[in-house]
């Protein structure tokens, strides 16, 4: 039985375009191949071709996400489920309708590029998507980012589970009640629609779809959605997941030539194992080079889309030039990584790694967590916002982001935390906290840990050999730290011993521990006492200083 056509779907919103209109009339261009989308983008002056074959575009004024312009429509079906607040801002149905009407009128006056894809490699938990874009370059972006359905799946597709209308050139009326600017990213769960207006940053489309899945998977499927990358051992088929906010190393650390890449950013964890929500990767590329990150460097070729990357006079990308933004990005299909596991599915994880970028430089490069400590760090999600990932962020800023992805989680954090706790409760999954940020001092004093060292630490955690090390217990942060690791200088593993001044380290560690405690008391005081007890303890610093002893105790 033939499926519903994109024109029929879009007509429900008032978009009257068709694929074969009369001469010189705007039209729908549906499911174009990547090469044709590149041609359209260049012809329409949306971007330029780089010497490596990638399409290079500029996103305009907004070079990162705009959290203050992200909204969820407050409808009866979600009113009592959404964790409303600064992250999930409510918008009235009336304001939503006004924005949608403007976008529909705007799109009816120009060609619209339609891409059909899927969110979720596991067909038991897939959501079908129809994305209508003003720009060919954004259609190419989402084509490469979504899980790609088979031709026969498209042929029999009925109504999509969600639609996206992306009109970066449309400026909303800031006078519409609830809006903060001329840009708006709006999710309507009742109508199953996402509106993206006034911003050319393609990550808004990607993260809006992720936010939708972060609601639908737990509520409808009992699946834990995760802001993480995932990889697989090619021999044992054991999997690992890497949690972390943008810029903490998820993409870089999961693109490992010795392992199979399942995905770099968004996954689900079901009773059967894990699966990639996407079909592509969206990597930061500031400072990208072939030596340190060859897999990502070589993935930037024809079919990839670079955002805000500067080209030299020979059209060669200059990844060190951040004159447009720190948040230079490249999107490419996962198949561009040679060792990609294109099935996008794997077994229950053997290892979970929480990646944090510590701007204070006091957390160890790697530490082992108990089950309760894993719950603690999952709900608190300490990291630093990296320059460029959000508008206005120009230097690392310490922050607590629940679940290492709070900006994309519509439900109460405890919904997700409880699901993770249930999945690691049997003890088969080892959990580590990995600091990819500063060591030897805070931002401006110390330096960011070398990628090669982090890779070695992660490799030893994945193969289990790090457990052969002697561990010391950090009394302030309440974690166990290995004292040796192959490929890593012993001196950097215990931060207090690496700082030039132990007194300054103690003070900085105490201050961060206080931040942990205050954040926990403010948001999570209702959690079990065992979880609270597994977190940092600022009082330990004062007690130790009073007794004149160190802050580390030996533990095997």
Name each model feature, range by range.
Residues 160-162, 166-218:
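Charged, amphipathic alpha-helical linker segments immediately N-terminal to NTP-binding catalytic cores
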Residues 115, 223-230:
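A short glycine-rich, hydrophobically flanked beta-strand micro-motif that places a catalytic Asp/Glu
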Residues 250:
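Conserved lysine of the Walker
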Residues 2-49, 227-245, 255-258, 268-498, ...:
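Glycine-rich, often acidic-flanked micro-motifs
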Residues 78-84, 188-193, 397-403:
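Gly-rich Lys/Arg/Thr-decorated short loops/hinges at beta-loop-alpha junctions or inter-strand turns
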Residues 1-156, 547, 551-552:
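N-terminal accessory targeting/assembly segments
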Residues 492, 497-556:
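Generic C-terminus detector
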């Amino acid at each position: 039985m033939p499926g519903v056509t994109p024109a029929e779907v879009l007509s429900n919103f008032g978009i009257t375009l068709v694929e074969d209109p009369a001469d010189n009339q705007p039209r729908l261009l549906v499911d174009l191949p990547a090469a044709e989308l590149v041609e359209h983008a260049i012809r329409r002056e949306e971007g330029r071709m780089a010497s490596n074959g990638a399409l290079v575009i500029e996103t305009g004024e907004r070079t990162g996400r705009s959290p203050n312009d992200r909204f969820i429509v407050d409808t009866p079906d979600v009113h009592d489920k959404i964790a409303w607040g600064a992250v999930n801002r409510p918008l009235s149905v009336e304001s939503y309708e006004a924005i949608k009407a403007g976008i529909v009128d705007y799109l009816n006056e120009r060609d619209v590029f339609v891409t059909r894809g899927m969110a979720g490699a596991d067909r038991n938990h897939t959501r079908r998507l129809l994305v209508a874009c003003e720009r060919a370059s954004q259609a190419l972006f989402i084509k490469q980012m979504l899980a790609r359905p088979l031709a026969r799946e498209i042929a029999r597709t009925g109504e999509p589970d969600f639609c996206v209308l992306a009109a970066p050139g449309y400026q909303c009326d800031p006078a519409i009640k609830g809006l903060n600017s001329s840009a708006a990213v709006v999710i309507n769960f009742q109508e199953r629609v996402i509106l993206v207006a006034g911003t050319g940053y393609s990550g808004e489309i990607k993260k809006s779809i992720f936010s939708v899945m972060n609601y639908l998977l737990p509520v409808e499927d009992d699946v834990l959605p995760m802001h993480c990358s995932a990889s697989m051992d090619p021999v044992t088929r054991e999997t690992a997941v890497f949690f972390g906010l943008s810029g903490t190393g998820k993409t870089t650390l999961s693109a490992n030539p010795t392992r199979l890449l399942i995905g770099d950013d968004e996954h689900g964890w079901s009773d059967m194992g894990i699966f990639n929500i996407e079909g592509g990767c969206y990597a930061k590329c500031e400072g990208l080079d072939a030596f340190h990150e060859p897999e990502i460097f070589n993935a930037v070729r024809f079919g990839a889309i670079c955002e805000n990357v500067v080209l030299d006079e020979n059209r060669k990308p200059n990844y060190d030039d951040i004159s447009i933004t720190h948040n230079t990005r490249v999107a490419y299909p996962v198949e561009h990584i040679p060792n990609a596991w294109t099935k996008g599915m794997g077994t229950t994880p053997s290892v979970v790694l929480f990646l944090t970028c510590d701007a204070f430089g006091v957390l160890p490069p790697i530490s082992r967590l108990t089950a309760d400590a894993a719950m603690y760090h999952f709900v608190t999600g300490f990291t630093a916002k990296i320059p460029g990932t959000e508008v206005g962020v120009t230097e690392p800023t310490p922050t607590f982001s629940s679940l290492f992805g709070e900006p994309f989680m519509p439900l109460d954090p405890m919904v997700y935390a409880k699901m993770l706790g249930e999945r690691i409760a049997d003890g088969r999954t080892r959990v580590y906290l990995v600091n990819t940020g500063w060591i030897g001092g805070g931002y401006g004093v110390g330096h960011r840990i070398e990628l090669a060292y982090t890779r070695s630490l992660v490799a030893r955690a994945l193969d289990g050999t790090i457990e052969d090390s002697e561990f010391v217990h950090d009394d302030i942060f309440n974690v166990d730290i290995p004292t040796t690791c192959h490929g890593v200088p012993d001196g950097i593993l215990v931060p207090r011993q690496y700082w030039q001044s132990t007194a300054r380290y103690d003070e900085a560690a105490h201050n961060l521990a206080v931040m942990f405690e205050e954040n926990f008391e403010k948001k999570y005081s209702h959690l079990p006492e065992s979880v609270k007890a597994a977190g940092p303890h600022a009082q330990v610093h004062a007690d130790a200083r009073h007794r004149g002893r160190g802050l580390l105790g030996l533990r095997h």
